[in-house]
């Protein structure tokens, strides 16, 4: 699972996901990509599940790039705990995704293979996505 080696602060505010992605919204490395259409938090487990699904389908063919990294810690309070006594402890990591963001890229495979692999990866994501190709 992906997570930062170290961070300046252990806990973060939740923040808001408004607007569209201004960075990371163009294909840079591969020829085909999976683009987010909705805002969401995507966990490191979901990113890894998508990457594995694509790798398994492509079967050593082509190359896959993961364009998102989970750098936001999400805290969870223990079950049956009274209110107060501070914020919970960091439980897992998420990546803040805005519409337009490229999640995965793929190259070195035919479009049919890339499209099918990304469809499987899209099923692992909690948001609607679209398949795009470089001009």
From Swiss-Prot:
GO BP term, pick one: mitochondrial translation
Compartments where found: Plastid, Chloroplast
Region (Disordered): 1-21
Primary localization: plastid
Annotated InterPro entries: Ribosomal_uL16 (IPR047873), Ribosomal_uL16_bact-type (IPR000114), Ribosomal_uL16_CS (IPR020798), Ribosomal_uL16_dom (IPR016180), Ribosomal_uL16_sf (IPR036920)
Domain of life from the UniProt record: Eukaryota
Gene Ontology MF annotations: rRNA binding; structural constituent of ribosome
Residue ranges, compositional bias (Basic residues): 1-17
Keyword set includes Ribosomal protein: yes
A GO-annotated cellular component: chloroplast
Keywords from the named record: Chloroplast, Plastid, Ribonucleoprotein, Ribosomal protein
Family designation: Belongs to the universal ribosomal protein uL16 family.
Quaternary structure annotation from Swiss-Prot or TrEMBL: Part of the 50S ribosomal subunit.
Protein's UniProt name: Large ribosomal subunit protein uL16c
The species this protein was found in: Amborella trichopoda
